[in-house]
Amino acid sequence: RNGDEPMMRVLAAAGADATKSNRFGVTPLMAAACLDYYEGETAGPFSGVPEPQRLEAVKLALALGNQINARTTFGDYKMIGTPETTLLRYPDNFQDLVDLGTGDPRFAEMTALHGAVICNQPSIVKYLIEQGAEVNARNRLGWTPLMISGGLYIANAHKTSPGSAQILREALAAQGLNRR
C-alpha cells in the first residue's frame, strides 16, 4: 500500500534507507505524498491509504530526512506541447517517447507538492507548504501545482483538486507570487 506510515516505520527501523529514491528520482516523501500511483490507474482494488494516514507518512518521510523540494528525474527528453495542452494530453511527440522506458515523461522534475495536488489531498498540500515546499515549482513542461489543481488528464481520467487550488492561491498571494 502506498502512503503506509506503519510499514514505513518498520522499514526504517530495519535499516532501510529512508531517503533513497527509485530510478526516476521518486523519493519516499514523493511516494507518501502520492506521486507514485493514482486510483483508477489500474483495474485493481484501492491500494492506497486514507488521506490522514498518508499525511502521517509525509510527516515521517520529512522527519527521516527527505528533501521537501526534491525533483523527479524521468530523463531529459524533448517534449513538444504547451504546459496547458500537455495537462490534458500527452506531448505531441509522445510516439517518439513511448519506447524509452521512462514511464510518463510529463512527470519529469515533479515535487512532492505536485503529487499531493494530483491526488487531491488538501491537508498534505497545506502541510508541505507550511514546511517550505516551493509553491510555484514548475516541472519540465512548466506545470505548477496550481495549474495541475485545475485539471490533469491522467490514468484515463480528468482529475481536479479544487480544495488544493484554494490553499495554493492563498499561499501564492501570501508570498506575492504569480497565481498561475
Set out the residue ranges of the language-model regions.
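Ankyrin repeat boundary signal
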Residues: 18-21, 70-71, 104, 137-138
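Ankyrin repeat domain, specifically the short helix-to-loop turn at the C-terminus of the second helix
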Residues: 9-17, 59-68, 126-134, 169-175
